[in-house]
Amino acid sequence: MSKYHPLTTEEAIEFVKNIPGFFSQEAQLECREIGDGNLNLVFHITDSKSNKSIIAKQALPYVKIVGESWPLSLDRARIEREALQQEHQLCPELVPAVLGYDDELALTVMEDLSSHTIMRKGLIEGNTYPLFANHIGEFLARTLFFTSDLGMNQQDKKELVKRFINPELCKITEDLILDEPYRFSDNNNYGVYIEDEAEALRTDQVLHLEVALLRERFMTRTEALLHGDLHTGSIFVTAESTKVIDPEFAFYGPMGFDIGAVIANLLLNYAAQPGWTSGEKALKEKRDWLLETAIQVWEQFESRFRTLWDEHVTDHLARTPGYQDLYLQKVLQDTIGFAGCKVIRRIISLSHVADIDTIADPDIKEAAERLALAIGKALVLCNRKLHSIRELGDIVRTATAIQTKGASRI
């Protein structure tokens, strides 16, 4: 019989007391549950004497936003913990350390990041992070290269593919991102004022073809171990530091899905900026920074990935002239396509982003949603034609100009 049960704050304290070498025997531990996501309990445990602190995260057997009618396997906690360990091994400065775990309790204990800010919150507050593109480019290059056939023994990689089969959470992605926004679904969640946009998504067969091709790649391409949910709510930042958390959606899939997720969330904040920034000059500066950062995410990833390829690939066929360029061209196209799907999903499907949802002015919020959808659709429609990440700037600025001009006529 399983010992699993949702922990109380007292039980969380008792568990972390037994982690070797962290809290002293004289520690006076206090605990509060701070989880604000849909899938987990998160306990913040602090020693009031030393101020040392730790995080304990426990998976729930259902989706909190829906309830017990949407059950989930607790094995995702094991997947998240192993993904964190894998990522920390490859990028120790960019991923919190796992300090303890209990797979039966679906519990992982890790380094506390209270000194950092959730990136989504920081962006909403108007902060910029000049080192972010460098850091996340490094994270993406190392985690994707060294878990792919390019960077590890191919047979060992196949064993990892087995360990990270994650059907339930992949199904969430397949439904919420790559299916339901393009048809009627009870999971869709949007304001009636953009029903025209939702109807356009349901009837655009050209768009559907591109989404179908991206969905096929998501479901069939085991290129590398992905984080699987790499949005700005899964990234903690300071001006000097970046930490990636929450890889419970981890699985083997197409590299562009992770890179596209980061870019998509920067573009969602771009669309939301009129709700958070006053004045044309300040708005332009903030949007320019967000767009340039999105471009730099790819450029930093690509530069590091090429270096890792040149230094570490042992398969002689992977060194064939032209292969590296073609490989990365396809990853770029996937990145843009998946970024577009991610943007669309955050407006139409379940679970939106605070960047847009918490805008107080309803007219500004609607304009942000319409701009996000225009950007998302443009990215999906052009993904197979893209040859340079710098084209992203033209696509986004064109969509912005068209939406702004259209809004001024109303």
PLM features: residue spans?
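Short, flexible, glycine-rich and Lys/Arg-enriched loop motifs at helix boundaries
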Residues: 61-73, 271-286, 310-325
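ATP/Mg2+ or Mg2+-diphosphate-binding catalytic cores
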Residues: 321-410
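A glycine-centered beta->alpha junction motif in the catalytic cores
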Residues: 59-65, 112-126, 145, 268, ...
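Conserved NTP-binding catalytic cores of kinases and kinase-like/nucleotidyltransferase enzymes
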Residues: 1-106, 390-410
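ATP-dependent phospho-/nucleotidyl transfer catalytic cores
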Residues: 118-227, 238
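Active-site activation/catalytic loop segments of kinase-like enzymes and analogous catalytic loops
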Residues: 82, 256-313, 339-355
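Conserved ATP-binding subdomain of kinase catalytic cores across diverse folds
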Residues: 50-53, 58-169
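Active-site acidic catalytic loop and adjacent metal/ATP-binding pocket
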Residues: 32-49, 54-55, 211-257
